[in-house]
Amino acid sequence: MTIAYLDTSAAMKLVLDVPQSDALTAELTAREDRRLVSSWLLHTEMHCAAGRHPQDVDLDAVRAVLDSVNLIDLTRGDLLAAGTHAPLRSNDAIHLAVALRVGADEIVTYDGELVERARAAGLPVLSPGTASHQ
């Protein structure tokens, strides 16, 4: 079983029709042994995006994506570890800290800074539909 940590930049591509959406969907559905995980931060970020942009973000689509992801509780240790991932923005640092804590096999992200920090931490990155996709 491959554990794939899904960050918000990737999850939003599953609810919006953007250039990488089809490639991401194809990649995530290509392997039956891939288990999607994320922290509860994903829930917050996606619902906030839907609230801020209701004309663009369908709440039912958000719920469907969240239903397909195993959401993991944040710990104090995650927040402390996130502080060591400078210069990442706080939410990205939290996502990286949780991905590392749960032993994710890969992180699915389209955030350039998070891509760099994840690779530096030894975590393989998936960004289907981009030049940086491995």
Where are the language model's segments positioned?
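Alpha-helix capping/helix-boundary segments
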Residues: 10-11, 42, 78, 95, ...
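Acidic, PIN/NYN-like endoribonuclease modules and their adjacent C-terminal/linker elements
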Residues: 2-3, 43, 68-72, 100-101, ...
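Acidic catalytic patch
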Residues: 60-86
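Substrate-recognition element of Asp-dependent hydrolases with the DxDx(T/V) motif
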Residues: 37-42, 46
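Phosphate- and divalent-cation-binding pockets in alpha/beta enzyme and binding domains
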Residues: 23, 45, 81, 116-117
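Short beta-strand scaffold positions
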Residues: 6, 37-38, 73, 90-93, ...
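Short, well-structured N-terminal submotif of metal-dependent ribonuclease cores
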Residues: 1-38, 52-60, 121-133
